Regions:
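Solvent-exposed, low-complexity, repeat-rich "mucin-like" stalks and linkers
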Residues: 25-28, 33-62
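Extracellular glycan-targeting catalytic surfaces
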Residues: 118-290, 298, 302, 321-328, ...
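Short, solvent-exposed loop/turn segments enriched in Ser/Thr/Gly
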Residues: 45-51, 90-98
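A short beta-strand micro-motif common to beta-rich folds, especially ectodomain repeats
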Residues: 82, 92-105
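Bacterial N-terminal signal peptides that target proteins for export
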Residues: 1-10
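Surface-exposed binding patches on compact interaction domains or structured appendages
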Residues: 54-83
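Flexible internal linker/loop segments at domain or repeat junctions
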Residues: 334-370
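Bacterial Sec-dependent N-terminal signal peptides
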Residues: 13, 18-39, 103-121
Length: 494
């Protein structure tokens, strides 16, 4: 799955290895210089992988299993980039095959380890932001006026949507991911909100406008390759999520043609292409100065997961949630991003800082490196983790109830950080975030996101105290990523 995005790096490494070997021995060298790892992990879906080595003699390569085949010559001389093809694993258990590389009298072994499918998702639309059942429940609540706050939120939504009917999409067609997300906020929010308006009113004018916005962006942007930097896939994921949600809400509603669906999903596949580039870029650069579990990495798997759900692709879903081929899959992110008492923080934190406690989030180090952005970035990480968990929950995998082998659970994060937004005091608890009070809620860290905490942890006293504190207006609380946050907890009708 990593094939096409590493070619230039691979060739450079091969040339470097060749130069080093030539400098150390002018005679024929029959040692094998591996550029590939000795062990290669492949997801259950299989696919293509590159094996790289240098040999200054004739060489051969072979496999000891039938499920690994070669798309390249199996013998040659000198530099070698061998494309192997691994079949989907339908055996029901993890398996391993061995590649044997013979060069002169030397042999090197590469182990190919392939996992089994562990994630069974019940595909349904909609499910990425809301399920059909949730949408119909909100519609019933509005019609019955059974919740004043939900009704007021609905009225706010419809005001936005009626204005959005006059909106004309103007897609950003440059290659800068930062500008992409900036330009996507309004069209993304409009498309998602209009899709909601369609569900609540059944008036197709809202659906048609939503689809028009998405398809305009799809046609303009589907062939763009973005500048590969540390933020590329993160910005694309966050920018595209609302439009993916809108598509998910409308794809089964007889409001778009097959051609339109193809135009849109062809564009959505940028999430995989750019996601894989970013995953590889972060891994090969030691996570850009040892930022091992932070919001960018959550966004990488979140983007591939939402693409998999939008297109009913089990292999992408498995890769995002639980795959040895993904160095930061969702399960690893849950255990890595969430601290337990005594965990080792990011090495970029200042020496002598208060030790992390249960429920804190790895991105807190932004208090030191931001500076004074610890609460902003822990909120972002929690938002992305929770949005990812909600997608899984809506498709039958409850990650809100999941506790990692080392004890981490999303509930701890909601409960730890809710007190900061209830008191609006960054100096409480350990004092680590002291100095951030003036910035709280001003950089996207909307307390309304805790409606998601209320939805999945309705018995949590800290979360309930925040929701009822009056710190934020529940009816008007709005996030570019999620829209009106009150709808997220509509089932908890207090």
């Amino acid at each position: 799955m990593k094939l096409e995005y590493r070619y230039s790096i691979i060739l450079a490494l091969l040339l470097l290895a060749q130069m080093l070997m030539a400098c150390t021995d002018n005679a024929k060298n029959t040692e094998i210089a591996l550029v590939s790892d000795n062990t290669v992990n492949i997801g259950y879906g299989g696919g293509e992988e590159l094996v790289k080595f240098i040999c200054y003699d004739k060489w051969t390569i072979s496999s000891d299993v039938s499920w690994i085949t070669f798309d390249s010559p199996t013998e040659g001389n000198g530099n070698a980039i061998i494309k192997i093809r691994v079949e989907k694993n339908t055996s029901g258990e993890d398996r391993m095959g061995k590649l044997s590389i013979a060069c002169g009298g030397n042999i090197e072994i590469i182990e190919i380890k392939q996992s089994v499918k562990t994630i069974d998702i019940g595909h349904k639309h909609p499910s990425i932001l809301y399920t059909r059942e949730e949408l119909l429940n909100i519609k019933r609540m509005v019609e019955a006026n059974s919740s004043a706050s939900v009704t007021t939120t609905y009225n706010n939504l419809m005001t936005r949507c009626n204005n959005a009917l006059n909106y004309t999409a103007a897609p950003y067609t440059g290659q800068d991911p930062t500008k992409f997300i900036e330009e996507s906020y309004i069209p993304g929010s409009n498309s998602r909100d209009l899709a909601l308006a369609y569900w609540f009113t059944q008036d197709k004018k809202y659906a048609r406008k939503s689809v028009e916005i998405i398809e305009t962006w799809a046609k303009a942007c589907r062939d763009i390759s973005y500048v590969a930097d540390a933020g590329s896939a993160m910005y694309l994921t966050r920018g595209m999520y609302p439009m993916v949600c809108a598509y998910d809400m409308l794809v089964t509603e007889d409001v778009m043609s097959d051609e339109t669906k193809k135009n849109i999903t062809d564009w959505f596949h940028v999430l995989y292409r750019e996601g894989m580039i970013s995953i590889n870029l972060w891994e090969s650069n030691d996570y850009f100065n040892k930022q091992y579990y932070q919001n960018h990495l959550v966004a990488h798997s979140m983007g591939i997961l939402m693409l998999g759900l939008a297109t009913d692709n089990d292999e992408l879903i498995q890769f995002a949630i639980d795959s040895p081929a993904n160095p930061r899959d969702v399960y690893e992110l849950l255990s890595g991003c969430i601290f337990m008492d005594g965990d080792t923080p990011c090495s970029r934190e200042k020496a002598g800082s208060a030790s992390p406690v249960k429920g804190e989030i790895y991105d807190r180090y932004r208090h030191d490196t931001g500076p004074l952005k610890g609460l902003q970035y822990t909120h972002l990480t929690l938002t992305l983790l929770s949005t990812t968990a909600r997608m899984c929950y809506n498709n039958g995998l409850d990650l809100f109830a999941y506790t990692a082998p080392t004890g981490e659970n999303l509930r701890y994060c909601f409960e730890y950080y809710s007190d900061f937004y209830r008191t609006m005091d960054s100096c409480i608890k350990s004092g680590y975030y002291c100095g951030e009070t003036e910035r709280m809620t001003k950089a996207g860290d909307n307390p309304g996101m805790y409606e998601m905490g209320l939805r999945y942890y309705p018995d949590s006293e800290p979360v309930r105290q925040l929701i009822s504190s009056g710190t934020f207006n529940r009816e008007s609380s709005y996030m570019d990523l999620l829209g009106y946050t009150r709808f997220l907890s509509a089932e908890i009708n207090d």
